[in-house]
Swiss-Prot record:
Stored Pfam families: MATH_2
Residues in coiled coil: 204-358
Lineage, top ranks: Eukaryota, Viridiplantae, Streptophyta, Embryophyta, Tracheophyta
InterPro entries: MATH-CC_domain_protein (IPR050804), MATH/TRAF_dom (IPR002083), TRAF-like (IPR008974)
Highest taxon of source: Eukaryota
Keywords, alphabetical: Coiled coil
Name this polypeptide is given: MATH domain and coiled-coil domain-containing protein At2g42480
Keyword Coiled coil: yes
Record domain MATH: where: 5-131
Length: 370
């Protein structure tokens, strides 16, 4: 008779996003440790079915010659516990050993089923496993249990509850010297010894967890302190921020003014720029002094810069005006020169005419004498 309650229930969220093999945590059934694993996209590239397997857990902690004999089946459900698939139960027992750590179904559910609309609810898949009638041999020095769903299992001569077998195996695996020296014949003494051993192991584990929790808390405190300091550095006080902004903006304004001064100097009007240079020096000295805490300093600097801009503008207009006057003066001089050139040209013409006339009169006179 199969138990109506599954031995283990494996819930997988975001199943459609899974590609690689998925393994469950270890669980105990009948005093033995097991775990499930499945291939959501098939065991190989050519497979078009999901694969399901039941495997022995922590096999390295078992003695040589260990084995498990069991029947089992899988039930695959959706989020609302609707059964989507149930595997068949084999007639023969499956023998789990070193050569065969796992048994299962290579072709369980077709992958095409998962593409059907509404097949999976909220992208969640649930796998339940039912295990029955097993024989467990823990290898050299281990005991044998043949009862169906036994409540206890014998480990190195000591009867332990199935729920505690994981802890006992863990102790013997991590400390094999205890298992080698543990050979009492008195059953009462065995039980008390195992209880003391389990309690001591739990106590040490709890202390280790407390220490780890303390270390984690300290790490979190340091992280919070670092984050707090970073926030304090990033959140600069308003006074300092205004001063820094003034400094940066004023550097740009000063650079711009200096470039304009250089352009004016290129026009060879040095005498008219002396006052501007002195004012620029005053501004540079004022910038090096400590700024007031309130924002009025920013407004004062902006007004000061505006005044400088106006002075520059007026000086540029003066320069442009003088340049224009000079150009006009040069133009009038050119006109006078042109007029003089015309007068000279006219005089030359008159002289040439007079010379020509004199030459003509002389020629006629010689002709008459002859």
């Amino acid at each position: 008779m199969w138990n109506q309650k599954p031995c283990f229930r494996f819930e997988i969220d975001n199943f459609s996003e899974k590609k690689d093999v998925i393994a469950s945590k270890a669980f105990v059934s009948g005093g033995c440790e097991w775990f499930l694993y499945l291939y959501p996209k098939g065991q190989s590239l050519n497979d078009d079915h999901m694969s399901l397997y039941l495997s022995v857990a922590n096999s390295k902690s078992l003695g040589s010659g260990w084995k498990r004999s069991a029947k089992f089946y899988f039930s695959v459900l959706n989020e609302s516990d609707k059964e989507l698939y149930r595997s068949t139960i084999s007639q023969e027992f499956c023998l789990f050993c070193v050569q065969a750590l796992a048994w299962g179904i290579r072709k369980a559910l077709p992958l095409s089923k998962f593409e059907e609309k509404g097949f999976l609810e909220k992208d969640k898949l649930i796998v339940e496993v039912y295990i029955k009638n097993f024989e467990a041999v823990d290898g050299e020095g281990g005991g044998v249990s043949k009862k169906e769903e036994e409540e206890t299992v014998e480990i190195i001569g000591s009867q332990d509850y199935a729920s505690q077998v994981t802890l006992v195996r863990k102790i013997f695996a991590e400390h094999p010297e205890i298992a080698e020296e543990f050979k009492p014949k008195n059953q009462v003494f065995k039980k008390e010894y195992m209880n003391i051993l389990r309690n001591a192991y739990r106590k040490v584990s709890e202390l280790a967890e407390v220490k780890m929790d303390w270390v984690k808390s300290k790490i979190e405190e340091v992280s919070l302190e670092i984050k707090k300091r970073n926030d304090e550095v990033s959140e600069v006080p308003l006074d300092n921020k205004i001063a820094d902004d003034d400094d940066d903006d004023y550097d740009e304004w000063e650079q711009d003014i200096e470039e304009r001064l250089k352009n004016l100097e290129g026009m060879e009007f040095d005498s008219k720029l002396d006052s501007l240079k002195s004012k620029l020096d005053e501004i540079s000295l004022e910038r090096k002094k400590s700024y007031d805490a309130d924002g009025s300093r920013v407004q004062q600097l902006e007004e000061r810069v505006k005044d400088i801009e106006l002075i520059l503008k007026s000086k540029l207009e003066e320069v442009s005006s003088e340049k224009k006057k000079k150009a006009d003066a040069d133009g009038s001089l050119e006109d006078r020169v042109k007029n003089l050139e015309l007068m000279v040209s006219d005089l030359k013409v008159e002289v040439d005419n007079e010379k020509a006339k004199s030459s003509a009169d002389g020629f006629l006179l010689v002709e008459e004498v002859a």
